[in-house]
């Protein structure tokens, strides 16, 4: 009896310990609702419904509704930027009024139109999309500075909405509206943040290799089955009232993506009949594209919000990398140095860079960059 009693107490102790562990785990999972569990739920939800038609129907509004596509006045507009030219790539850089130093750095590096024209026989156009200074104290002087800057470079496109995070969808509408009105012949359109590096030589070479009449083309870092962020402490917080569903349609990270001209036209058309109050611009882009039946394609060398490793073997393949402000000159020198390109030439060079890329991209602890599969491409 004594042994049985001890065994019983020991069994009860382990049951209690197990119960405490399970309860603690459940509490942790509840706290992490916007993380792993939410992603699992949203991804399952995405494949169960297999269609977002009901989202499109719910967010559709008549063109004359106030929550439909707004119309803002151009304060600065370079309407003759394309001039009916044969434009391979129209590159929009999303910028803020105060970021003049970033714009100047881009003009000298990856946004250098003359370099691409002379070295790659390709016509690209780079313009900066922005709103107005949100701080009323600074707005007057900032606007004067922007006018002076545009007189020198003729590459600013500005409308009279406040340039804030919650107006990013308005900046998206500015871009596709401007394409529709002033540069409809551009074969490809890119949207990029002003804190990324775009390897324009690699990008232009890739775009030139595509069929002439490429359609339904949309590439970038694709987010599939992503859930809305419900934490009010996040700047990406989206309330249920704005978007009540468990996952978004597939979309590309807003840091950088490229579309063909027909996709740009379709997105613009869809945006005219959708509720524009959703301020997460890349998600809104995904909803517009989904309404028109356009599906994003994953390109392994678009880093999205990630940052590429610093290595010549990476530079040979990279398209975009995020989080670059003070190193654009260095990256541009690497991008335009023929010795860097020749590093991966030949059988030995190719094998060397393959091995280096595997070592750089396939670390389990290094996830915020290109995927491991990029090393094999």
Curated annotation (Swiss-Prot):
**Glycan attachment sites:** 56, 167, 275
Q: Please give the residue ranges for the topological domain Lumenal.
A: 31-377
Which Enzyme Commission number(s) are listed?
2.4.1.206
The biological process GO terms on file are: lipid metabolic process; protein glycosylation
Cytoplasmic side stretches: 1-12
Superkingdom classification of source: Eukaryota
InterPro entries per UniProt: Glyco_trans_31
**Cellular location(s):** Golgi apparatus membrane
Q: What is this protein called?
A: Lactosylceramide 1,3-N-acetyl-beta-D-glucosaminyltransferase
Q: Which organism is it from?
A: Xenopus tropicalis (Western clawed frog)
Underlying gene: b3gnt5
């Amino acid at each position: 009896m004594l042994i049985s009693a001890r065994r019983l107490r020991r069994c009860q102790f382990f049951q209690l310990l197990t119960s405490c562990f399970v309860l603690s785990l459940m509490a942790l999972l509840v706290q992490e609702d916007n993380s792993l569990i939410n992603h699992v739920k949203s991804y399952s939800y995405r494949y169960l419904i297999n269609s977002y038609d009901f989202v499109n129907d719910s967010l559709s509004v008549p063109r004359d509704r106030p929550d439909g596509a707004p119309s803002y006045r151009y304060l600065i507009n370079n309407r003759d930027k394309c001039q009916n030219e044969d434009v391979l790539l129209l590159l929009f850089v999303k910028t803020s009024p105060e970021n003049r130093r970033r714009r100047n750095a881009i003009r000298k590096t990856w946004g250098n139109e003359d370099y691409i024209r002379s070295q790659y026989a390709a016509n690209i156009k780079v313009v900066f999309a922005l709103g107005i200074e949100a701080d009323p104290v600074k707005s007057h002087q900032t606007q004067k500075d922007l006018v002076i800057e545009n007189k020198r470079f003729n590459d600013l496109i500005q409308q009279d909405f406040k340039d804030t995070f919650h107006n990013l969808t308005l900046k998206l509408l500015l871009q596709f509206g401007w394409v529709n009105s002033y540069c409809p012949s551009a074969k490809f359109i890119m949207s990029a943040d002003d804190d990324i590096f775009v390897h324009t030589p690699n990008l232009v070479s890739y775009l030139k290799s595509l069929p002439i009449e490429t359609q339904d083309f949309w590439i970038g870092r694709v987010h599939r089955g992503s859930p809305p962020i419900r934490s009010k402490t996040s700047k990406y917080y989206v309330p249920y009232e704005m978007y009540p569903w468990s996952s978004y349609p597939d979309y590309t990270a807003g840091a950088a993506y490229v579309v063909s001209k027909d996709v740009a036209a379709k997105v613009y058309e869809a945006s005219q009949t959708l509720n524009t109050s959703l301020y997460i611009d890349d998600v809104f882009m995904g909803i517009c594209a989904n309404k028109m039946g356009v599906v994003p394609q994953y390109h392994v060398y678009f880093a999205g919000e990630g940052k590429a490793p610093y290595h010549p073997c990476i530079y040979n393949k990279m398209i975009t990398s995020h989080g670059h402000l003070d190193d654009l000159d260095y990256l541009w020198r690497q991008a335009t140095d023929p010795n860097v390109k020749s590093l991966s030439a030949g059988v030995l060079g190719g094998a060397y860079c393959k091995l280096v890329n595997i070592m750089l991209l396939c670390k389990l602890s290094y996830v915020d960059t290109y995927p491991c599969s990029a090393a094999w491409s």
